[in-house]
């Protein structure tokens, strides 16, 4: 009798354990890089012209006070940042990292090799916290990302 009771309880645990449930589909965030900017992150995207990253450093410095950014808000979990290089004539990349001390404690993803006209996926398992995302090769400003909820 004890054996049957133990087997029944074990069966319930196996059936009801959350890990046995199908994993949620990842969230896909589509982003478009144009010279000196990530379009979806800007309140009022502008069409800058740049043939190299040095020009973007100058453009970003000169326009810093005029530009406002949208806060990207996501829930924790597997996230795919699908990034497209639109009309930037040099290879780009993408970088998500924690802000401040979060840079040490939160997950990060980065990569390069994003040529003009190409799209690349950057996959990360986001945890709650405050992040920044940008392209250091374009370069773009650091855009805010807040991950909260369940």
Language model features with spans:
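N-terminal post-signal-peptidase region of extra-cytosolic proteins
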Residues: 59-71, 76, 81, 107, ...
């Amino acid at each position: 009798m004890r054996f049957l009771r133990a087997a029944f309880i074990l069966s319930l645990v196996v059936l009801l354990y959350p890990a046995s449930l199908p994993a949620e589909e990842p969230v896909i965030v589509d982003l478009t890089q144009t010279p000196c900017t990530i379009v979806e992150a800007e309140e009022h995207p502008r069409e800058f012209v740049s043939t190299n990253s040095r020009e973007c450093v100058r453009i970003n410095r000169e326009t810093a006070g005029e530009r406002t950014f949208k806060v990207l808000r996501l829930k924790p979990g597997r996230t795919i940042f699908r990034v497209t290089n639109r009309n930037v004539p040099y290879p780009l990349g993408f970088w998500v990292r924690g802000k401040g001390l979060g840079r040490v404690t939160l997950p990060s993803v980065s990569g390069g090799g994003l040529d003009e006209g190409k799209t690349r996926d950057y996959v990360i398992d986001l945890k709650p916290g405050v992040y920044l995302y940008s392209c250091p090769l374009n370069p773009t400003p650091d855009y805010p990302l807040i991950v909260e909820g369940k």
